[in-house]
UniProtKB/Swiss-Prot annotation:
Transmembrane segments: none
Residues that bind L-methionine: E55, Q98, D249, K280
PROSITE patterns, per database record: ADOMET_SYNTHASE_1, ADOMET_SYNTHASE_2
Record-linked InterPro entries: ADOMET_SYNTHASE_CS, S-AdoMet_synt_C, S-AdoMet_synt_central, S-AdoMet_synt_N, S-AdoMet_synthetase, S-AdoMet_synthetase_sfam
CDD domains membership: S-AdoMet_synt (cd18079)
UniProt: ATP binding residues: H14, D174, G175, K176, R240, F241, D249, R255, K256, A272, K276
Region Flexible loop, residue ranges: 98-108
Protein's UniProt name: S-adenosylmethionine synthase
Phylogenetic placement of the source organism: Bacteria, Bacillati, Bacillota, Bacillota incertae sedis, Caldicellulosiruptorales
Top-tier EC class: transferase
Organism: Caldicellulosiruptor bescii (strain ATCC BAA-1888 / DSM 6725 / KCTC 15123 / Z-1320) (Anaerocellum thermophilum)
Keyword Cytoplasm: yes
């Protein structure tokens, strides 16, 4: 049976992604000086204005306006004619401390207060919020990500590359990509549709943009065997995309959570990542759930795996762990869930310890996806638990 699935990505110059990158640049700058800081940093951008707000508790000082401007400059908004300029935009900051009501639950977990867990056993941190998080992996690509989002990200990164390297100098920072993949019996067989929208300078013709994007962006990214004469390609389908970035649309941190994860191919708990320190389970537990799912697929126990984990604020142990292999598991989902509980410690402090998350590693994943990154060595992308999983699988 044939079916289609579509995922989208955006470039680093998209207004929402500008915000994600500034939020994570602030987080990284603080974690570099104070690894135990509490950070919840949100950003909004609009024409000529950046607003940085949130709750930050730290012993260090960072120059937030400078971090914001440097990030905008790196993205490529360096001239007013691009609709946004790192040097002339206004930067307003409004920062408070973390609520003491939240801090009391995170500083010392409920289990530690009740004496169930010694301080020596693990630094006892309760979850920073309630909620449920999902992790996913499948064997469609070498990085164990779904193919539609994998290709959409590669196209978006390629757009930025040809712009920054001067291959297509008329391109500007804002842009979006979208890929529709056709599946036969649950395996990707061809690319049905590609959509690329890219901001550009006013003097270039639509015909030139179309020809150049096909030649320098689409062909180098989409595997040759996946494109055919019936593949539909849409490039700047409105015909013009000169006004873009924060001048075209306002942006907010955390509005691209599907782009950040699996492109809609797997479920999402609703929590965003950027600007949050690792005591926030929205971020750390979602990374851990990806780590679990990826190791299960890498071990060969399933072709597809989705892991759900849930928490209560101030409580360290997960309330629930659920595994769904969509009928692809070599053993039952319940048995795999048992293996997960034995192999992985999903208490927030253990996640932070095992994945070494109190480091400035976040800005690099704030654009082009937090998962399946071939260009980065991310701890939650490692498949170093396969041996333990297979050993436990013999005992269940």
């Amino acid at each position: 049976m044939r079916k289609l699935f579509t995922s989208e990505s955006v470039t680093e110059g998209h207004p929402d992604k500008i915000c994600d990158q500034i939020s994570d640049a602030v987080l990284d700058a603080i974690l570099e000086k104070d690894p135990y800081a509490r950070v919840a940093c949100e950003v909004a951008v609009t024409t000529g204005l950046v607003l940085v707000m949130g709750e930050i508790t730290t012993k260090c000082y960072v120059d937030i306006p400078k971090i914001a401007r440097d990030t905008i400059r790196e993205i490529g908004y360096t001239r007013a004619k691009y609709g946004f300029d790192a040097d002339t935009c206004a930067v307003i900051t409004s920062i408070d401390e973390q609520s003491p009501d939240i801090a009391m639950g995170v500083d010392k977990a409920l289990e530690a207060k009740l004496g169930e867990m010694t301080e020596d056993e693990i630094e006892a941190i309760g979850a920073g919020d309630q909620g449920m998080m999902f992790g996913f992996a499948c064997d469609e690509t070498p990085v164990l990500m779904p193919m539609p989002i994998y290709l959409a990200h590669k196209l978006a990164r390629r757009l930025a590359y040809v712009r920054k390297e001067g291959i297509l100098p008329y391109l500007r920072p804002d842009g979006k990509t979208q890929v529709t993949v056709e599946y036969e019996d649950d395996k990707p067989v061809r690319v049905d549709t590609v959509v690329v929208s890219t901001q550009h300078s006013p003097e270039v013709t639509h015909a030139q943009i179309e020809a150049d994007v096909i030649e320098h962006v689409i062909k180098p990214v989409i595997p040759e065997g996946m494109l055919d004469k019936n593949t539909k390609i849409f490039i700047n389908p409105t015909g013009r995309f000169v006004i873009g970035g924060p001048q075209g649309d306002s942006g907010l941190t955390g509005r691209k959570i599907i782009v950040d994860t699996y492109g809609g191919y797997a479920r999402h708990g609703g929590g965003a990542f950027s600007g949050k320190d690792p005591t926030k389970v929205d971020r750390s537990a979602t990374y851990a759930a990806r780590y679990v799912a990826k190791n299960i697929v890498a071990s060969g126990l399933a072709k597809k795996c989705e892991v759900q984990v849930s928490y209560a604020i101030g409580v360290a142990r997960p309330l629930s762990i659920r595994v769904d292999t969509f009928g692809t598991g070599k053993i039952s989902d319940e048995k795999i869930a048992e293996i997960v509980k034995r192999v992985f410690d999903l208490r927030p402090a253990a996640i932070i310890r095992d994945l070494n998350l109190r480091r400035p590693i976040y800005k690099q994943v704030a654009a082009y996806g937090h998962f399946g990154r071939e260009d980065l060595d991310l701890p939650w992308e490692r498949t170093d638990k396969v041996g333990e999983i297979l050993k436990e699988a013999q005992n269940v």
